[in-house]
Amino acid sequence: MRMLRHLLLPMLLLAAAFCFAKDKSKDRFLQPGPIHIDKAGQKWADKTLRKMSPEEKVGQLFGIRVNAQFLNDADPIWLQLRDNLDKYHIGSLVMSVPVDGAVLLKSPPDVAAELLNRLQKSSKLPLIVAADFERGASMRLTGTTVFPHAMAFGATGKTENAEVFGRISALEARAIGVHWNFFPDADVNSNPANPIINTRSFGEDPKQVGDFVAAYIKGAHEAGMLTTAKHFPGHGDTATDSHLGLAQVTGDRARLDTVELPPFRRAIEAGVDAVMVAHVTIPALDSEANQVATTSTSIVTGLLKEDMRFKGIVVTDALDMAGLTRLYMKDIGRAAVESFKAGNDVLIMPGDLDASYRSVLQAVQSGEISRQRLDQSVRKILELKASLGLNKARLADPGQLSIEVAKPENVATGQRIADEAITLVRDNGKVIPLQSFTSPGTAGAGLPYQSLTEANNRLVVVILSEDLRTDSGRMLERQILARAPNARVMYVDARSAAGMTPAVVEAVQAAEHVIAAVYVVPTAGRAIRAAGGGLKNSVAMNDSTGSLLTAILDHAASRTMVLAMGNPYLVQDFPAIENYACAFSNVSVSETAAVKAIFGEIPITGHLPVTIPGIASRGEGLERPVRSSSAQPISGGSSHVQP
């Protein structure tokens, strides 16, 4: 008996150690490194796949949305998330943020990391966490390095900017617990009326777009981030937002081969990890009526996997977008089934998770989807997880946040890129840089909301915002008042434009210099232009703010510098614009860059990465040197006017 006890004790200890080891990944911090699957990772993927039930395999296909926010353990949102992971055997998360109208309710990175770690611990298998970090983590979180929109990178003409952007974004994302970026955007923005791509694209030239795409992939891979080329086979030549309706690419196959597809081929050559398929119809590739690329076997399997020989992960765009859901109103679950049958591996953000999961599972059980086809995709997903090291450790190390996120040198890099992007298209009034002058009256800080009669009107700044609840214009105002404390800053949006027009017109009539900063950026799922409106741009100003800008130009066109803090094409709607500069983005670094350029503190060296029909061709841009050091800044008191 004693001998038996001596034999049993080591065996029990070994068994206990083995059981403990199986769960160690839930308690270990994942150290980001090269994306590579080793023998142990391959063995884990094979073993895990063999043990999985059909229900678990189907669950691995789905990526569900999680908003980065603090959640109490008893919060219904947390309980639903936790239960969904278990009930549907979810394979991936798509990190986003809560939205209140036009306002993104962003959280700091530590809140996001803590929530993602809790979800990782709650999941039987490690989760891949994806995000739309098109402008880096700052697109979804506060306190991170800010980068401008992709088109700003195109305006710099320097692919090395995209590479360093990829590296910094990856370092910050991995520190937070995000492994997979739905970027770079490989769309060629060849249609100025495109309502959803616009400044999200690097430009209109297929080669330039491809070069920037490849550079971003290289940088992101250096810091261990999975990348995604989107929106296959091209969303740049559409005139409809696929979040709102059915978009169509009308070009023939020859045009697709020379314009839309080259950046995706370049991405594949660069080793992109995933390709995201768009909810767009392309008659030249699939002539079936209302057949979107997402559910087209000819496009996903025939073109992407076979003709272009892409071996990585194929992921859908969000399945809750109207461009897809309107085609499956009677049976929303079929959208997921048809997407998977077409060749997609990962199905993200279904409009109805339960219906989508059950529909795919039923299709597997009935034989409509073969077990072999299911295993192919699940194996790719498991191998992707192992290539990240998630089989060994799955938690983000909170200690890395203060090391990797918002490093001063990285913040400076984001600002430098925004500076280099500023593009001067017109300067007929010779207003750049602003000439020095001395403001009359008493210098010093004025009270906010002063009446017009009390304020100094030598420099008037009109911020034409899409919604005053957003941060648009705040950094621009701070930077201008730091240089010209007596400037009058007036905020206007669609709801206030009509009432503010008399006051704005009175101010600009008396002003020596006027800056009109126009904030218009492509925003998913929001109709920007009112039906029947007179403006022809799809990413355009609201008619009321457009009318106000027209009034400003009627009274002070030669003295007004119009800043495009987003869509560069909007100048088409206002032929009276005499002075025009593009920042290509509404983020804080672009606001700072625009002010620095106006005051001559930085050279203006950007060149248009797109053609503005009837205005300027791609590659054009007026260059300006730094202002002479002998010039003096504008001085005086401050005034801030809001409705």
Which role fits each region the language model picked out?
Residues 12-20:
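Hydrophobic h-region of N-terminal signal peptides that target proteins for export
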Residues 50-53, 80, 103-123, 127, ...:
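Second-shell residues forming the walls of enzyme active-site clefts
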